[in-house]
């Protein structure tokens, strides 16, 4: 269903922004597009091509951004469904993808002056070109103040101040999502479901924050291809950290196994139940 936002707030502009200063700029560009008779189906692209900040510090409640609204919707679903029967709830968050938008309180968890930029920001000796990219995704996030340039190796070169701000934004966005997951977990506890619900937290890729002079994903370095995976089963008393590779295709057979369902024979993935129990390393 449609997401709901707190009283006084509308859907974030361009899907991202709630900061009043940014909203004013976006409105001005939109009015210019209308005055220039831009096709209304292309107005958002017209705006994004001219103004799309890579981060935003919002003096807003959690629910004003889409991820807070998604968390609230998930909590509403848990209140409405019949949880006496088995249920499956998939919750997909946008952050910490770009742009790094989050309420101010999550930015204030970190001191930007103490943030360290990546120590190694150049192309490795004898590295293959295909492993690198120009960080086109990052370059698509623009404001009049931000100037992107490429170094002699064709890699994105950002000044230290902007790098620290982006890393700060990544941290803030990650903490924002952590808090939304916490809210859903609290609802499970409130409904007495925390002791019989399997929870999986995973990301779809890693992220470069200036290392190798790379930003975003889109590389074949482990920094981009490795993603987090946390599986919680309340029946398992001890946690294990697994260092051997797993794959996304392992999730379905793992959940089937943990739910005592038959695992289809035609799957490429493998159940990780043994690893979760500490039986397999």
Regions found by a protein language model. Give the residues of each.
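His/Cys-centered metal/cofactor-coordination and adjacent catalytic loops
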Residues: 1
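Active-site region of PLP-dependent enzymes
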Residues: 4
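Active-site-proximal cap/lid insertion segments
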Residues: 7-72, 76-196, 200-245, 258-266
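Zinc-coordinating Cys/His ligand positions in small cysteine/histidine-rich zinc-finger domains
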Residues: 248, 252
């Amino acid at each position: 269903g449609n997401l709901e936002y707190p009283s006084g707030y509308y859907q974030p502009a361009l899907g991202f922004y709630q900061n009043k200063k940014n909203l004013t700029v976006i409105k001005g560009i939109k009015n210019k597009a209308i005055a220039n008779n831009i096709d209304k189906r292309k107005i958002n692209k017209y705006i994004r091509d001219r103004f799309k900040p890579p981060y935003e510090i919002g003096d807003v409640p959690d629910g004003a951004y889409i991820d807070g609204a998604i968390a609230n919707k998930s909590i509403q679903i848990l209140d409405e469904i019949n949880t006496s029967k088995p249920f499956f709830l998939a919750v997909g968050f946008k952050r910490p993808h770009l742009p790094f938008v989050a309420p101010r309180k999550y930015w204030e968890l970190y001191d930007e002056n103490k943030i360290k930029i990546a120590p190694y920001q150049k192309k490795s000796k004898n590295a293959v070109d295909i492993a690198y990219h120009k960080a086109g995704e990052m370059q698509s996030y623009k404001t009049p103040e931000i100037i992107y340039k490429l170094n002699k190796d064709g890699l994105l070169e950002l000044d230290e101040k902007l790098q620290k701000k982006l890393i700060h934004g990544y941290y803030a966005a990650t903490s924002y999502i952590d808090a939304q997951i916490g809210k859903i977990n609290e609802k499970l506890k409130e409904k007495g479901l925390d002791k019989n619900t399997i929870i999986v937290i995973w990301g779809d890729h890693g992220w470069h924050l200036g290392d190798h002079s790379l930003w975003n994903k889109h590389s074949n370095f482990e920094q981009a291809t490795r993603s987090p995976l946390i599986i919680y089963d309340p029946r398992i008393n001890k946690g294990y950290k697994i260092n051997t590779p797993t794959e996304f295709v392992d999730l379905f057979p793992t959940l089937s196994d943990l739910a005592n369902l038959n695992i289809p024979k035609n799957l490429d993935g493998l159940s990780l139940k043994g690893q979760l129990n500490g039986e397999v390393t």
